[in-house]
Swiss-Prot record:
Its main location: endoplasmic reticulum. This is Inactive rhomboid protein 1. The keyword Cytoplasm does not apply. Homodimer, or homooligomer. Interacts with TGFA and HBEGF. Interacts with EGF; may retain EGF in the endoplasmic reticulum and regulates its degradation through the endoplasmic reticulum-associated degradation (ERAD). Interacts (via cytoplasmic N-terminus) with FRMD8/iTAP; this interaction leads to mutual protein stabilization. Interacts with ADAM17/TACE. The lineage of its organism: Eukaryota, Metazoa, Chordata, Craniata, Vertebrata. It comes from Rattus norvegicus (Rat). PANTHER family: INACTIVE RHOMBOID PROTEIN, INACTIVE RHOMBOID PROTEIN 1.
């Protein structure tokens, strides 16, 4: 048996190449005490070398003494609320959450407001500023290595970034050239624990790409005018998994055996992987071998270290040495070909099936983070950071993460759906900027045809009319409060109706309720009580007011006029009679005639007129077949629609302040809002989150509508004009908060100011409310200072932020309370205010907003 072992050993020695030398480090006896500063190693895969055979090594875990858990008091509800409120407003003492928000803010600022200062660019490590730095990471704590593995501790990552991999012979400028590894082909322990290592970001295994995602990618490529094949990265052979030369296992938790262990940015990783051939280390051709042997320069060949400047340009890690080539049967080892290898990067988790197909799709949907102050508007206005930014501010920018714009998507869906339904139900009004007139011959209440004219304001937004928008929920003061002018107008009309009577034609062909002046004395009889003998009695006396066509307290059964519920003397307070006892044979002229006119609510100011149905339909009014007097109907309830008033005499639809934010004047108006939301609003929501943006959006819109209802009470206004200008105010606040880190803040300010002034000038057109713009902008400015966290430039800024939150919240509440008082208790009548929101270039360019303008 021993002889067979000697034969086997000699056979192995004969097969061993002469150049192969095995240097196995001696095992150092375990020390009596393990170093306390070492970090325990959780996974044994980190101690396995790729260049050595994979053996099962047992690493003893460090001994931990059992510790008793410290008793802690449960946090009180007051402290929890206080801490949560501080975190929400961005004034928490938790440095992690504060730095995370501040880093995100600066990153957003770099995309929106232009170039940063030079010192910021040098110190800031953003994805858009890819500079190779060997001193960008901190030194990770060393891993705990068991006693049996102490002989393999010195494994140096040649190009690992950070102070953990610098030697004592660093140059004076703080940089040093990378050292070659002691064990070629081995994975460095520090590579796995470094913050720059790909092992800290192990991706989970994903499912194969769905048909829907591939269809969406193809549609996106066609929209961009590209071919579907151009949308993917070029590959050698199309396969759903990476060849075995990268990694042998399909799915690994941590790398046990790696050929290479150097990693770079994820973007470079996928880009490089997709361009490699199937086999990275292919055998060169004979002609290529001859050329390599003749090459005079051997510095850049296999095994040679790249120059530092070339490394910084490529941003890639050095590949490790190729393995030894198998000896030919001739007995001599074939010369190692000097092949310049591509700078490859292998993912720590290993390639997976479907990776080559998923890479272009991820690039298609990839979105860069929004640097604080440099969002979409910042890119349009060429904003940049300063050259120097404090490291504390820089960390705040880096820690910021983008939010998902849920509120923007929900708002866009609601706006689109409501606009489509409104146009489909109420139709489209005449398109234009002036007034549209319609003339036709219509049967009037006297029984003859007359030429009448209907005037309607044109809508250049391609949408419904003003009456339809009011019925849908537009901002309209007479529907939100008891307007003094409208109420006085209704009372005056009732006073005239109180002295009216039924005008009966002599041939009994018809009758209508009218005044004495409108009733012909030759062709008709004006049945006026108590002069006419048909006057009934009330408490022993003749009634002084009446008669009413087709209504008499003596013949009405429901509701009956019986003591103690007799109908009052004033006919404007009579109820609607739903059932008569005698029909048309009462021997009373005002009851036996054919009525030709009933109440019709015309216009948007509560005007009621007793007329024929044909005329009411032509004027697009609300005809009341059941009533005989205008006092028996409530026209404002018909005009406003929605929920009925609690008191028919007092409108109370205050919810129009926020309901109108979801309505639009037309299709074009909705498209403008959608474009604004998908650009500016979506960009800001990524910065602040949906809850903050929703608060600013809704409160700014409500404040803008409230101011518009005060100064333009008789104008129907829809759309989120105040909300959009409140969002524009957020851009100004973001600019002010990032003023210290921008290279040219004044230029960015004037560009943004020019955009806002242009939008204010655009508000001088009809159907656009500048009062909502101004009030929404001012309220949005206050709310942004209160609810938008920002970059902190020191401890003083933290206290300033707390004072800022309290002050601006108090100012906004004061502004809102003042507007509420003006609207409900001290109405303001401003005759020149309409010129601020619409300049009448012609007589018919602007709609007349005064009360008497629409009365025909």
């Amino acid at each position: 048996m021993s002889e067979a072992r000697r034969d086997s050993t000699s056979s192995l020695q004969r097969k061993k190449p002469p150049w192969l030398k095995l240097d196995i480090p001696a095992v150092v006896p375990p020390a009596a005490e393990e170093p306390s500063f070492l970090q325990p190693l959780r996974r044994q895969a980190f101690l396995r070398s790729v260049s050595m055979p994979a053996e099962t090594a047992r690493v003893p875990s460090p001994h931990h003494e059992p510790r008793r858990l410290a008793l802690q008091r449960q946090t009180s509800i007051t402290q929890t609320i206080r801490r949560g409120t501080a975190d929400w407003f961005g004034v928490s003492k938790d440095s992690d959450s504060t730095q995370k928000w501040q880093r995100k803010s600066i990153r957003h600022c770099s995309q929106r407001y232009g170039k940063l200062k030079p010192q910021v660019i040098r110190e800031l490590d953003l994805p858009s500023q890819d500079n190779v730095s060997l001193t960008s990471t901190e030194t990770p704590p060393p891993l705990y290595v068991g006693p049996c593995q102490l002989g393999m501790q010195k494994i140096i990552d040649p190009l690992a970034r950070g102070r953990a991999f610098r030697m004592a012979d660093d140059t004076a400028d703080g940089l040093s050239a990378p050292h070659t590894p002691v064990t070629p082909g081995a994975a460095s322990l520090c590579s796995f624990s470094s913050s720059r290592s790909g092992f800290n970001r192990l991706p989970r295994r994903r499912k194969r790409e769905s048909v829907a995602k591939m269809s969406f990618r193809a549609a996106a490529a066609l929209v961009k005018g590209r071919s579907i094949r151009d949308g993917t990265l070029r590959r050698g052979q199309r396969r759903s998994f990476t060849p075995a030369s990268f990694l042998e296992e399909d799915m690994v938790d941590f790398p046990d055996e790696l050929d290479t262990s150097f990693f770079a940015r994820e973007g470079v990783l996928h880009e490089e992987l997709s361009t490699y051939p199937d086999e990275v280390f292919e055998s060169p051709s004979e002609a290529a071998l001859k050329d390599w042997e003749k090459a005079p320069d051997q510095a850049d060949l296999t095994g040679g270290a790249l120059d530092r400047s070339e490394l910084e340009r490529s941003h890639l890690m050095l590949p490790l040495e190729r393995g030894w080539r198998k000896q030919k049967e001739g007995g001599t080892l074939a010369p190692q070909p000097k092949v310049r290898l591509r700078q490859e990067v292998v993912s720590a988790a290993g390639p997976r099936r479907g990776q080559r197909i998923a890479v272009p799709v991820r690039k298609l949907f990839a979105r860069e983070k929004r640097p604080y102050g440099l969002g979409m508007v910042g890119r349009l206005t060429n904003r940049t950071y300063r050259k120097r930014i404090d490291s504390y501010v820089k960390r705040q920018i880096e820690d910021m993460d983008d939010h998902r714009p849920f509120f923007t998507y929900w708002l866009t869906f609601v706006h689109s759906l409501v606009t489509i339904l409104a146009v489909c139900i109420y139709g489209i009004a005449p398109v234009g900027f002036s007034q549209h007139e319609t003339v036709d011959s219509v049967l009037r209440k006297r029984g003859v045809y007359e030429n009448v004219k209907y005037v309607q304001q044109e809508n250049f937004w391609i949408g419904p009319s003003s009456e339809a928008l009011i019925h849908l929920g537009a901002k309209f003061s007479p529907c939100m409060r008891q307007d003094p002018q409208v109420h006085n107008f209704i009372l005056a009309a009732r006073e005239r109706e109180k002295h009216s009577a039924c005008c009966v034609r002599n041939d009994r062909s018809g009758c209508v309720q009218t005044s004495k002046e409108e009733c012909s004395s030759t062709l008709a009889v004006w049945v006026k009580w108590p002069v006419h003998p048909s006057a009934p009695d009330l408490a022993g006396n003749k009634r002084q007011f009446g008669s009413v066509c087709h209504q008499d307290p003596r013949v009405c059964d429901e509701p009956s006029s019986e003591d103690p519920h007799e109908w009052p003397e004033d006919i404007t307070k009579w109820p609607i009679c739903t059932k008569n006892s005698a029909g048309n044979h009462t021997n009373h002229p005002h009851m036996d005639c054919v009525i030709t006119g009933r109440p019709c609510c015309i216009g948007t100011k509560g005007r009621c007129e007793i007329t024929s149905r044909e005329y009411c339909d032509f004027m697009k009014g609300y005809f009341h077949e059941e009533a005989t007097l205008c006092s028996q109907v409530h026209c404002m309830d018909d005009v406003c629609g929605l929920l009925p008033f609690l008191n028919p005499e007092v409108p109370d639809q205050f919810y129009r302040l926020w309901l109108s934010l979801f309505l639009h004047a037309g299709i074009l108006h909705c498209l403008v809002s959608v474009c604004f939301q998908m650009t500016v609003l979506r960009d800001l929501e990524k910065l602040a989150g949906w809850h903050r943006i929703a608060i600013i959006y809704l409160l700014s819109g409500v404040t803008g509508n409230l101011a518009s209802a005060i100064f333009l009470p008789y104008r129907a206004e829809v759309g989120p004009a105040g909300s959009q200008f409140g969002i524009l105010a957020c851009l100004f606040v973001e600019l002010f908060q990032s003023w210290q880190i921008l290279a040219r803040p004044w230029r960015a300010f004037f560009k943004l100011l020019a955009v806002v002034l242009f939008l204010f000038a655009f508000g001088l057109l009809p159907w656009i409310d500048n009062f909502a713009h101004i009030s929404g902008f001012v309220s949005g400015l206050f709310l942004s200072f209160a609810f938008l966290p920002y970059i902190s430039f020191g401890k003083f800024d933290l206290y300033r932020k707390r004072c800022q939150i309290i002050i601006f919240q108090a100012v906004f509440l004061g502004l809102l309370a003042g507007l509420v008082v003006l609207f409900y208790f001290y109405p303001v009548r401003c005759e020149w205010c309409e010129f601020l929101t619409c300049i009448p270039f012609t007589d018919k360019f602007c709609e007349k907003y005064e009360l008497d303008a629409q009365l025909h």
